[in-house]
């Protein structure tokens, strides 16, 4: 059976899991962390993804990209994109009405779409899984906020394609979390479960009924632009004002200072979840001024009060839409790191008249856990836990067409279970009208100008007839990913026209995706070449230094001819000088230099060994050996130290 994974592609952190032997493994990355920052950085020499990218963000704020999820599937002039751009240190420009990210990479100006940046994070998650599972992994379920619209879902699916994944299904984050909660509780009769998912950048609430392995979403609501980052921003603005008051200086123009402050604010926010006060200490924040201050939990709650209160609106809406009263909610499950904030927990508990939320699931890992289970189901896993699992999700937004006068006429109402298909008959608006323009919208407002245009197409060649006579059957078909296909049929002539909404101008074309896939492979190869180059450089450097140290070893001093020592010393000195002035040399240059040094040193070191006095663990004579590995240990010696490579 092929190995499948579930990926929670988050705004700020991502997580990957794999289901086998009736359980889910959440897979740690190469740094040992079970979540990976959704960051990609570009430098003069390399591309960094995950922890390495986030760790250098203060030094390289303009070329370190994060929050791609707040851009994906949106238009450049989206008000939320415009407001986010004000506090991002990286550059977002418009290309064909879509936002693209502009960075300096290897000395050139490059642009990347949000899909490409997300694909790099997905590729990192895929590689994390491959390293652990020991083999190639392509099948994946990727999660999105329940409230993501059609274009955001499609763009996320494209990101998966660019990362070389076969995206089995796009599933909603709260639904995935519900699987994590309900998988072991499937035999407890029917229960109503409310998932409250407040992450780094998005917020969802879903109400599900869980019974014997069937997870049925009754309603969903949310805000695709509310999360932990918004709380950080409130703290950042608060401290920028405080710094201004104390020092009469404004740091907003200095990207590095603002970034260091944001990192400190994120840390303080986490501290405030367990302590009543947090201190902020940043040395030389701006123009040599140290910034030492503190904040109380009460003040933090006051700064974010309106945002916290805002989380209750979708809860009310979900209960209203699903016609369930709050007393009938059996369990409340908190998901997403931001639900650790005590004030948020209290608001939820108070809303449900003091009912305590479930504490048994990990808020950072639940979504990836559920996605991994669903991936196993979709690749044919039949273990006892998954064999009866059935997910019934819903469309988060109503979808319909524009009719005369700019009216939104929904064919599929929000919270309809998907997959679903719905047809309606429409007609012409004026006599002898030769064609109709079918414009597809999503949203809850009565006028299409207040809704989101998904796409449009023309059905032409209608025979002349009085208005209202031709019969045009419009069919909406939403698949299990929540992605829409629309077709129109003119009954008189049998003419049809169809559109997968995603062929709209906002979507990447097949050619663009193919190009991005090829580029992704190229970048990956470049990354691997760069790490090979660094490795060769480090090998040479540590070989040179360990040679020098060996010759200075008191036990060896009297066994080395002065002239031999001088020869090796000179070669080592030349090598180190060459290294200092050729840090960007190619891998084979470093390897050639190592061979050159070995050809001088090996005969001399061999002479010392034959004299029988070498301690274990001398610099190896074998070309390419790890520095410090002895070529056959000295008589009576041990095999030398185990050497660990330090990058």
From Swiss-Prot:
<comment type="similarity">
    <text>Belongs to the heat shock protein 70 family.</text>
</comment>
<dbReference type="GO" id="GO:0005886">
    <property type="term" value="C:plasma membrane"/>
</dbReference>
<dbReference type="GO" id="GO:0044183">
    <property type="term" value="F:protein folding chaperone"/>
</dbReference>
<dbReference type="InterPro" id="IPR018181">
    <property type="entry name" value="Heat_shock_70_CS"/>
</dbReference>
<dbReference type="GO" id="GO:0005634">
    <property type="term" value="C:nucleus"/>
</dbReference>
<dbReference type="GO" id="GO:0140662">
    <property type="term" value="F:ATP-dependent protein folding chaperone"/>
</dbReference>
<dbReference type="GO" id="GO:0140602">
    <property type="term" value="C:nucleolar peripheral inclusion body"/>
</dbReference>
<dbReference type="InterPro" id="IPR013126">
    <property type="entry name" value="Hsp_70_fam"/>
</dbReference>
<dbReference type="InterPro" id="IPR029048">
    <property type="entry name" value="HSP70_C_sf"/>
</dbReference>
<feature type="modified residue" description="Phosphothreonine">
    <location>
        <position position="36"/>
    </location>
</feature>
<keyword id="KW-0007">Acetylation</keyword>
<dbReference type="GO" id="GO:0016887">
    <property type="term" value="F:ATP hydrolysis activity"/>
</dbReference>
<keyword id="KW-0597">Phosphoprotein</keyword>
<dbReference type="GO" id="GO:0140453">
    <property type="term" value="C:protein aggregate center"/>
</dbReference>
<feature type="compositionally biased region" description="Low complexity">
    <location>
        <begin position="620"/>
        <end position="633"/>
    </location>
</feature>
<dbReference type="GO" id="GO:0071014">
    <property type="term" value="C:post-mRNA release spliceosomal complex"/>
</dbReference>
<feature type="modified residue" description="Phosphoserine">
    <location>
        <position position="546"/>
    </location>
</feature>
<feature type="region of interest" description="Disordered">
    <location>
        <begin position="611"/>
        <end position="647"/>
    </location>
</feature>
<keyword id="KW-0547">Nucleotide-binding</keyword>
<dbReference type="GO" id="GO:0005737">
    <property type="term" value="C:cytoplasm"/>
</dbReference>
<dbReference type="GO" id="GO:0031072">
    <property type="term" value="F:heat shock protein binding"/>
</dbReference>
<feature type="modified residue" description="N-acetylserine">
    <location>
        <position position="2"/>
    </location>
</feature>
<dbReference type="GO" id="GO:0051082">
    <property type="term" value="F:unfolded protein binding"/>
</dbReference>
<dbReference type="GO" id="GO:0034605">
    <property type="term" value="P:cellular response to heat"/>
</dbReference>
<dbReference type="InterPro" id="IPR043129">
    <property type="entry name" value="ATPase_NBD"/>
</dbReference>
<dbReference type="GO" id="GO:0005524">
    <property type="term" value="F:ATP binding"/>
</dbReference>
<protein>
    <recommendedName>
        <fullName>Probable heat shock protein ssa2</fullName>
    </recommendedName>
</protein>
<keyword id="KW-0067">ATP-binding</keyword>
<dbReference type="Pfam" id="PF00012">
    <property type="entry name" value="HSP70"/>
</dbReference>
<dbReference type="InterPro" id="IPR029047">
    <property type="entry name" value="HSP70_peptide-bd_sf"/>
</dbReference>
<dbReference type="GO" id="GO:0005829">
    <property type="term" value="C:cytosol"/>
</dbReference>
<feature type="modified residue" description="Phosphothreonine">
    <location>
        <position position="339"/>
    </location>
</feature>
<keyword id="KW-0346">Stress response</keyword>
<dbReference type="GO" id="GO:0042026">
    <property type="term" value="P:protein refolding"/>
</dbReference>
<keyword id="KW-0963">Cytoplasm</keyword>
<feature type="modified residue" description="Phosphothreonine">
    <location>
        <position position="417"/>
    </location>
</feature>
<dbReference type="GO" id="GO:0051085">
    <property type="term" value="P:chaperone cofactor-dependent protein refolding"/>
</dbReference>
